[in-house]
């Protein structure tokens, strides 16, 4: 029998990982991601861990464990996983790279266009001053966001030192900061000593000082990419600046003082669409089958299968339809409703949204639909 410990927030977990789909005896133990601890591993001795970004995969979790052979993260980001350590231990790690790239890009576009609806027409064909969208980080999400911006006729100022120069990777970070109308962050969280260009506190007092006070800042990557202390100081000096945060430096706790200064704030749900979450589960399921199925350890007598197509209902949301009817934006995604839910969760006595309440908002989130782009 294969034993799996899985984050209970993984979409359609039991539709994918069961004895019928795998044709093999299997035990799936689901729990909150923050409860996947060394003690839990000691108790259940799992062969497989299926996680999301709240579970830290490192020596603290795994040093005393000898049972885990496969770790799948149903997320784009990997900064919660010490990949060097995992490799050293001979474990296989996979993530769901790109699974929610359209979901996050659509979240960013929703934020921009709900706050600045005039940008629908601020393009190269209708304006002599088209919107300049600055994108820092041009991986799966950043490059997808650029496609939406270019489709609206906006100008993209992109910066990614790890990508080759291109139509969208076309600016220095200084130019992005100084000349963008909106800046959207799409970088992993890396620390000094672990990267040539660490992103921890990339947006600090110096970076904020280079941005015009009218520049909107959006962060959907990792909270600590932005220094919240410096951001709060900047917002006190420049109250007109619009800032949208989906991630927070001290997540899952969110300061009420900071929240009060933000234009929009949501509980780390930018990628939370039905399509994005299902795609993440499908991707780690496929990788699991490759590891344990006919191409791998021959434990499972099955091949990869596309369950996602069977689980998705019809999708009425199309990007081109929204472009033709901008007034329907809130019907496609009402970002302000998610903002209200987070603000309503502030514990006045603590002066913050508590971690338990933040996690509950994520766990109970009604998944929105991803718009069809092409």
Swiss-Prot record:
Under catalytic activity, the entry for this protein gives: 4-phospho-D-erythronate + NAD(+) = (R)-3-hydroxy-2-oxo-4-phosphooxybutanoate + NADH + H(+)
Q: Which residues are responsible for catalysis?
A: 222, 251, 268
Q: What is this protein called?
A: Erythronate-4-phosphate dehydrogenase
Single GO cellular component annotation?
Answer: cytoplasm
Provide this UniProt record's keywords sorted from A to Z.
Cytoplasm, NAD, Oxidoreductase, Pyridoxine biosynthesis
Q: What class of enzyme is it?
A: oxidoreductase
Q: How does it assemble?
A: Homodimer.
HAMAP family attached to this UniProt entry:
PdxB
Q: Which residues are recorded as binding substrate?
A: 53, 75, 272
A GO molecular function annotation here is: 4-phosphoerythronate dehydrogenase activity
């Amino acid at each position: 029998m294969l034993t799996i410990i899985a984050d209970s927030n993984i979409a359609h977990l039991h539709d994918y990982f069961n004895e019928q789909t795998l044709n093999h005896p299997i035990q799936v133990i689901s729990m909150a991601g923050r409860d996947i601890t060394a003690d839990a591993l000691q108790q259940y001795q799992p062969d497989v861990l299926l996680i999301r970004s709240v579970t830290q995969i490192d020596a603290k979790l795994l040093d005393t464990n000898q049972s885990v052979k496969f770790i799948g993260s149903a997320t784009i980001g990997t900064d919660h996983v010490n990949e060097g350590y995992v490799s050293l231990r001979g474990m296989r790690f996979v993530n769901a790279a790109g699974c929610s790239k359209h979901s996050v890009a659509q979240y960013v576009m929703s934020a921009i266009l709900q706050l600045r609806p005039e940008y629908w027409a601020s393009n190269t064909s209708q304006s002599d001053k088209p919107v300049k969208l600055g994108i820092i980080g041009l991986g799966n999400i950043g490059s997808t966001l650029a496609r939406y911006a270019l489709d609206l006729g906006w100008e993209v100022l992109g910066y990614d030192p790890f990508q080759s120069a291109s139509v969208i990777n076309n600016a220095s970070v200084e130019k992005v900061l100084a000349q963008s109308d909106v800046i959207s962050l799409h970088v992993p969280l890396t620390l000094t000593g672990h990267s040539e260009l660490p992103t921890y506190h990339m947006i600090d007092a110096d970076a904020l000082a280079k941005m015009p006070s009218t520049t909107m800042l959006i962060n959907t990557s990792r909270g600590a990419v932005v220094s919240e202390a410096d951001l709060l100081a900047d917002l006190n000096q420049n109250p007109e600046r619009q800032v949208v945060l989906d991630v927070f430096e001290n997540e899952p706790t969110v300061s009420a003082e900071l929240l009060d200064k933000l234009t929009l704030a949501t509980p780390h749900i930018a990628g939370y669409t039905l399509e994005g979450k299902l795609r993440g589960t499908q991707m780690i399921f496929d990788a699991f089958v490759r590891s344990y199925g006919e191409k791998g350890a021959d434990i499972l007598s099955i091949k990869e299968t596309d369950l996602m197509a069977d689980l998705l209902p019809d999708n009425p949301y199309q990007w081109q339809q929204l472009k033709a009817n901008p007034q329907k934006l809130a019907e496609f995604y009402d970002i302000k409703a998610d903002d209200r839910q987070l603000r309503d969760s502030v514990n006045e006595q603590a002066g913050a949204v508590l971690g338990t309440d933040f996690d509950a908002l994520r766990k109970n989130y009604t998944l929105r639909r991803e718009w069809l782009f092409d």
